[in-house]
């Protein structure tokens, strides 16, 4: 059964980028392929810091948080592109925009994600 390490799932307003100010559901993965000194989510660098969850468990948590003003699910991390099949599996359960907040270093993995509307990366 497919599982991925998840730090947290929460609803909040996007604080940066094109969708600033919009309510989103955030799925924060654990694990990153880099070790940036300026990282603002140090607790998510190691995959061991997350709770292993199935796509259905994540989808259930997202459903609990959905409100009428929420139109986007943002997958963040750590590095969410480490889990392309998992993101594809969760995304197919929702008719919402799918955003990936990524370091951009795994373009082949990003291409594997079936339904992506927005890719936001840090240079």
Predicted regions and their residues:
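Conserved Radical SAM active-site core
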Residues: 4-8, 23-24, 38-114
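Non-cysteine beta-strand/loop elements that form the S-adenosyl-L-methionine
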Residues: 115-123
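Short beta-strand segments
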Residues: 28, 76, 120
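N-terminal pre-triad scaffold of radical SAM enzymes
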Residues: 2-38
């Amino acid at each position: 059964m497919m599982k991925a390490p998840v730090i947290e799932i929460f609803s909040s307003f996007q604080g940066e980028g094109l969708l600033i100010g919009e309510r989103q559901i955030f799925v924060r993965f654990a694990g990153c392929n880099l070790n940036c000194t300026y990282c603002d989510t140090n607790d998510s660098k190691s995959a061991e810091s997350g709770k292993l969850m199935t796509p259905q468990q994540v989808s259930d948590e997202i459903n609990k948080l959905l409100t009428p003003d929420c139109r986007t699910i943002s997958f963040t991390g750590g590095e969410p592109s480490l889990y392309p099949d998992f993101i594809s599996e969760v995304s197919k359960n929702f008719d919402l925009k799918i955003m990936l907040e990524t370091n951009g270093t795994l373009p082949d993995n990003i291409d594997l994600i079936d339904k992506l509307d927005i890719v936001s990366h840090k240079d």
